[in-house]
C-alpha cells in the first residue's frame, strides 16, 4: 500500500520506546504526533476523510488516548461524542463489559444512555493491539441497540492480531506496523 506524504510524516513522529511499560515491549509513543500541530491536523483530517460519508451519528472514544482523536473527529463529522471509561469513572448509571487480559480481566463502561438504538456508531482509539478493549466497547454499543459501523485507530499493531479478532472488514487504521 502506498502511503501519502502526510501519513509518512505522521509515522516519522511516532517514537519507539523500548522496554516500556515492561521489558520486551516496544511502545509506540504517539505524543510527538499530538504535540505537532501539522501532524495532529493530518491525522484528524485523514480520519474525517475516511468517515465523512458514512452517516456516523455517534463517536465513542476509548479511555484515554482514544478521547484525543474521538472528540475532534465527532466535531468534524457533526456527530455526538461519548466515552468508554474504566469502572467507577463515569458519574451516572452505566453498563459494563468485561474483557480478558493475558493475566486476568478488565472492564469498560458506558453510560446507559450513551448510545441509542438506531444510531450509527464509530469506535475510536489510538492503537489497536490485541483488540480486547475495542471488542468490549463494540459489545457495549451493540447491547444498547446501536449499529456498530466500524473501529478506527491511528495505529494498528498487526502482529498482535487485533483486526482478526474484531473482523478485518470492520477495522480502519491510518498506520500499520
Swiss-Prot record:
Keywords: Cytoplasm, Glycosyltransferase, Purine salvage, Transferase. Gene3D superfamilies: 3.40.50.2020. It is found in: Cytoplasm. The keyword Transferase applies. Pathway: Purine metabolism; AMP biosynthesis via salvage pathway; AMP from adenine: step 1/1. This is Adenine phosphoribosyltransferase. One of its GO terms (cellular component) is cytoplasm. Its EC number is 2.4.2.7. Signal peptide: none annotated. GO terms for biological process: adenine salvage; AMP salvage; purine ribonucleoside salvage. PANTHER family: ADENINE PHOSPHORIBOSYLTRANSFERASE. It holds the Pfam family Pribosyltran. The gene is apt. Catalyzes a salvage reaction resulting in the formation of AMP, that is energically less costly than de novo synthesis. It catalyses: AMP + diphosphate = 5-phospho-alpha-D-ribose 1-diphosphate + adenine. It is an enzyme of class 2 (transferase). InterPro entries: Ade_phspho_trans, PRibTrfase_dom, PRTase-like, UPRTase/APRTase. Belongs to the purine/pyrimidine phosphoribosyltransferase family. Homodimer. Coiled coil: none annotated. It comes from Anaeromyxobacter sp. (strain Fw109-5). GO terms for molecular function: adenine binding; adenine phosphoribosyltransferase activity; AMP binding.
Amino acid at each position: 500500500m502506498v502511503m501519502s506524504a502526510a501519513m509518512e510524516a505522521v509515522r516519522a513522529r511516532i517514537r519507539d520506546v523500548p522496554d516500556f511499560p515492561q521489558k520486551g515491549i516496544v511502545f509506540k509513543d504517539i505524543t510527538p504526533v499530538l504535540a505537532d500541530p501539522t501532524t495532529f491536523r493530518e491525522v484528524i483530517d485523514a480520519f474525517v476523510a475516511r468517515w465523512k460519508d458514512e452517516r456516523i451519528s455517534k463517536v465513542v472514544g476509548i479511555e484515554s488516548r482514544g478521547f484525543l482523536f474521538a472528540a475532534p473527529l465527532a466535531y468534524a463529522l457533526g456527530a455526538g461524542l461519548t466515552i468508554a471509561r474504566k469502572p467507577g469513572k463515569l458519574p451516572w448509571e452505566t453498563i459494563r463489559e468485561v474483557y480478558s487480559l493475558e493475566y486476568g480481566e478488565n472492564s469498560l463502561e458506558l453510560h446507559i444512555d450513551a448510545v441509542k438504538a438506531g444510531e450509527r456508531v464509530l469506535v475510536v482509539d489510538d492503537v489497536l493491539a490485541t483488540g480486547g478493549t475495542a471488542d468490549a466497547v463494540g459489545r457495549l454499543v451493540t447491547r444498547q441497540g446501536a449499529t456498530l459501523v466500524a473501529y478506527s485507530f491511528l495505529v494498528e499493531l498487526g502482529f498482535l492480531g487485533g483486526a482478526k479478532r474484531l473482523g478485518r472488514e470492520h477495522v480502519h487504521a491510518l498506520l500499520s506496523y
